[in-house]
Design a protein with these regions (language model features):
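Extracellular/lumenal ectodomain signal focusing on beta-strand-rich modules
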Residues: 88, 96, 147, 229-231
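A short beta-sheet element
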Residues: 140-201, 213, 223-224
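Short, well-ordered beta-strand elements within core beta-sheets of diverse protein domains
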Residues: 81-84, 182-186, 228-234
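Sequence-specific dsDNA recognition surfaces
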Residues: 74-80, 95-106, 118-150
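Extended, domain-scale alpha-helical bundle/helix-rich regions
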Residues: 6-76
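Specificity-determining recognition surfaces
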Residues: 202-230
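Non-catalytic DNA-recognition/assembly elements of restriction-modification systems
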Residues: 9, 18, 76-104, 237-244, ...
Length: 259
């Protein structure tokens, strides 16, 4: 197995709940998702975010099968789940767990970070470089993000090359960049940005995105609607922390062996 294959294997094991042991004392992911729904509802009512308060809820029935219920509609059995997950985990649509492609409102003279595609690290890194720009010059026609957001390339071949990062230490906490990015913003104290980053770099997510590409050859993209409907496995928050720590240590060991 090559180092690249090993890295991919680690991330796939991680999102399937096979990298660290489950702790029965952890608060289950279902409780975490309920907090997310409550926070999302509050933000929508306060006008701080746009969206509908009718999320889908995915649960395991008495027959051990998963069902999805959207609003007042009848539950629908999910036949296309990609793999099994531990009982303390939960499945969720990305649109129901994070904000996707949010926008920012700032004073025109605010200095922010500007990130081009070439400045975003690929592979299994978490890196980027930026230029300083005034908000007036980048507020229109570009993607918006802020500290703590996770961004990833949506266009081929940058998507397959895993160009993605957690944006932190931005100028005045905000940034803008290439329109060829999708932005994921976790709700406060819910899903870890580190877990989101490793999820979008996982073989499952990359292969799913490739299957959903649209557009002409050489200009294919993972569209917003397809991203929103992506199924994501969510561990309990405590397990997310253990997972991310384990991934970091294992990737460091691989990097050390390569040097």
């Amino acid at each position: 197995m090559t180092a690249e294959e090993l890295r991919k294997s680690i991330l796939q094991m991680a999102i399937q709940g096979k990298l660290v042991k489950q702790d029965p004392n952890d608060e289950p992911a279902s409780v975490l998702l309920e907090r997310i729904r409550e926070e999302k509802t509050r933000l929508i009512k306060e006008g701080k975010i746009k969206g509908k308060m009718t999320d889908s809820v995915i649960y395991k029935g008495s027959d051990n099968s998963y069902y999805e219920k959207v609003g007042k509609n009848e539950p629908v059995k999910l036949e296309d789940l990609p793999f099994d997950i531990p009982d303390t985990w939960a499945w969720v649509r990305l649109k129901d767990s994070v904000e996707i492609n949010p926008r920012s409102t700032l004073s025109d003279d605010t200095i922010v970070s500007f990130i081009e595609m070439k400045s975003l690290g690929g592979g299994f890194s978490n890196s980027f470089i930026y230029e300083k720009r005034t908000w007036k010059n980048v507020k229109n026609g570009f993607t918006h993000f802020r500290n703590g957001d996770v961004g990833f390339a949506k266009i081929t071949p940058c998507f397959q090359n895993r160009k993605s990062a957690i944006f932190n230490e931005l100028e005045n906490g905000y940034g803008a960049g290439t329109t060829e990015l999708h932005i994921l913003r976790p709700y406060k104290n819910t899903i870890l940005a580190d877990y989101l980053l490793w999820f979008i770099k996982s073989p499952y997510f990359i292969e799913y995105g490739k299957q959903k590409f649209s557009g002409t050859a050489g200009q294919q993209r993972f569209g917003t609607d397809e991203v929103k409907n992506t199924l994501m496995p969510i561990p309990p928050q405590a397990e997310q922390k253990r997972l991310c720590l384990k991934i970091k240590k294992m990737l460091q060991c691989i990097e050390k062996d390569e040097s």
